[in-house]
Design a protein with these regions (language model features):
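A sequence-level/structural motif corresponding to short, flexible coil/turn segments enriched
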Residues: 1-187
Length: 187
């Protein structure tokens, strides 16, 4: 499964493009999702029931200039639900994983919320995409998360970059949280 964006087969500017291939790379199906604005996917994972969860950003839907979009599909790429998260400024998701209870954890970037010019955002949802909690992490500079994984203790490990902390410009930033998104350590 491959996720990204396309201008060639879109309803508007760019649309989210999801392609399912067989083991030899032959296309089994391809789907586009989006509206009249720019929509892009940065992460896709197969879910426990054989469907897919897609995360990215949308300028077609939501509350702001660019919002996080989460799309849940069946095994054939048909939308089961789609949700947006964000504020009046730019928000983006770079990583999504299904959690052990069937919900989702989403990591990315927000300039709508947090302490600085842009902060890491971590959103925990239930199986239907409803927010259980959302947390931001960062300082007065810029932070962005590119990957999130659930850990064996039920918490999360988040990898990204920081401009606020560290020795230089855009250092690697690793955050370990508990199951509720509270920081246990950050390095």
């Amino acid at each position: 499964i491959v996720a990204g964006s396309t201008y060639s087969f879109s309803a508007g500017s760019y649309d989210i493009f999801l392609i399912k291939t067989d083991a030899n790379g032959n296309i089994q199906w391809a789907k586009t999702y989006g509206g009249t604005g720019w929509d892009d996917a940065f992460s896709v994972q197969q879910t426990s029931d054989g469907g897919y969860i897609v995360a990215g950003t949308t300028w077609s839907f939501g509350a702001g200039w660019g919002d996080i979009i989460l799309i849940r599909t069946d095994a054939n790429g048909n939308i089961i639900w789609a949700k947006t998260y964000g504020g009046t400024n730019y928000d983006n998701a770079f990583s999504v994983q299904q959690t052990s209870d069937g919900g989702y954890i989403v990591a990315g970037y927000t300039s709508s919320f947090g302490a600085g010019g842009g902060d890491i955002i971590l959103i925990r949802t239930d199986a239907n995409g409803n927010i259980i909690w959302a947390k931001t992490y960062g300082g007065t500079g810029y932070e962005e998360a590119y990957s999130v994984q659930q850990t064996s203790d039920g918490g999360y490990i988040v990898a990204g970059v920081t401009y606020s902390f560290g020795a230089g410009w855009y250092d690697i930033f690793l955050i370990k949280t508990d199951a509720n998104g509270n920081i246990q350590w950050a390095k």
